[in-house]
C-alpha cells in the first residue's frame, strides 16, 4: 500500500455500504487499513460486513432507516462506540424516484430529499461534533454528490435537487470547518452501472440510447 493512501488505524463510517458505490468505497477504505462500520437499510448489511471480515478486514454492519431522525442518531452513536472513535464519514446512501416532473408525487419528493440531503447533513453535524471533541480537532467528511448536482437530468427532479443541495451543503460546511481541522469534500460521479441506474442501463430504454449516443 502506497503510504499516501495508508489509513491504518483510522476509523470510518460509510452509509449505503451494502451495494453500489458505497460498497466499493467501504472496501477501498478497508484495503487502505481503516476499520469501517457500514450502514444499510436491511439486515443484509450484517451479511455484507461478515463478507468483508472474511477477507480479513475489520467491518461491522448496522441496519438503519436513514429517514428516521432518532434511528440515525442511535446508529451513529453505536458505530462510534464500536469503532472507539471516528476519523472519517462517507455519506454514500441515496434513493431514487423517477416520474415525469408534472406528475412527480410530493411524497416521493419528500422521501428523496430526506434520505439524500437531510440525513447527510444530520450525519455531518454528528461527525463534526465528534471530531471537535478531539484534543487536536480533525476529521474528514466525504459526501457523494452527482453529475446531476450540475445537470438536471430527466424525470428525476427530486434526485437532482437533493444532489445539488449536497454540493452546496458541502461547500458551506467546508467554509466553516476547514479552519478547525475538518476537511469536507464531495465527489460527483457520472452515470454508474449500479442498482439505482438499472432503468438507464436497460438497452431497450430510449434514455439509454440518448446517453450512449452522445
What do these predicted ranges mean?
Residues 32-47:
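Conserved glycine-rich Rossmann-like NAD(P)H-binding loop of the short-chain dehydrogenase/reductase
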Residues 124, 162, 170:
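Active-site helix of classical SDR
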Residues 146:
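Residue(s) in the substrate-gating loop at a strand-loop-helix junction
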Residues 100-101, 105-113, 208-211:
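Substrate-binding pocket helix/loop in short-chain dehydrogenase/reductase
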